[in-house]
C-alpha cells in the first residue's frame, strides 16, 4: 500500500504538470501559433478546448482540493466522463480541423500525450486513495463545507 501522503504529493505534482503543459499547449499552439479561434475549420475544436478548460476547475476542486465523497464525488466522476467524451471528440475532429494548417506538429502531439498521462496518474491516485465508503452514495464528506 502506498503512503497516502506520498500518493497525494505525486498526484498534486502530476496535476500541476498537466496544468502547465495544458496551459502552454492552449496559449502557445492554439492561440499564438495556429490562432485556432480565427480558423473556421478549427472553430469546433477551439470550442471543445474552451469547454474542457471550464470543466477543469470543478474537477480540480472536487478531486484535489475538497475531500469529496458521496454525491459530490459521483458528480465529479460524471464531470470526468463528460471531459473524457469531449477529449475523444477532440481527437476525432483534430486532424480534419487542422488539415489546412498542416496538421498537428509532433511536439504538440507529445505534449498532448504527456499531459494526458499526468492527468490520468493524478486522477488514478486520488481515486485509489479514497476509502471505499467515499463511493457510497449516502456518504458525506466534503472539507469545504
Indicate where each model-derived feature is located.
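Hydrophobic transmembrane alpha-helical segments in integral membrane proteins
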Residues: 1-21
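Membrane-interface helix-loop junction between the first two transmembrane segments
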Residues: 23-44
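Core segments of transmembrane alpha-helices
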Residues: 49-63, 113-124
Amino acid at each position: 500500500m502506498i503512503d497516502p501522503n506520498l500518493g497525494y504529493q505525486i498526484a498534486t505534482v502530476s496535476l500541476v504538470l498537466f496544468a502547465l503543459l495544458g496551459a502552454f499547449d492552449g496559449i502557445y499552439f492554439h492561440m499564438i501559433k495556429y490562432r485556432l479561434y480565427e480558423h473556421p475549420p478549427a472553430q469546433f475544436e477551439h470550442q471543445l478546448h474552451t469547454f474542457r478548460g471550464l470543466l477543469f476547475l470543478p474537477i480540480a476542486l472536487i478531486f484535489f482540493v475538497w475531500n469529496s465523497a458521496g454525491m459530490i464525488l459521483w458528480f465529479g466522476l460524471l464531470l470526468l466522463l463528460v471531459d473524457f467524451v469531449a477529449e475523444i471528440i477532440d481527437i476525432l475532429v483534430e486532424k480534419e480541423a487542422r488539415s489546412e494548417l498542416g496538421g498537428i506538429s509532433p511536439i504538440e502531439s507529445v505534449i498532448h500525450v504527456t499531459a494526458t498521462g499526468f492527468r490520468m496518474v493524478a486522477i488514478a491516485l486520488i481515486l485509489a486513495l479514497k476509502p471505499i465508503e467515499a463511493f457510497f452514495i449516502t456518504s458525506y464528506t466534503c472539507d469545504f463545507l
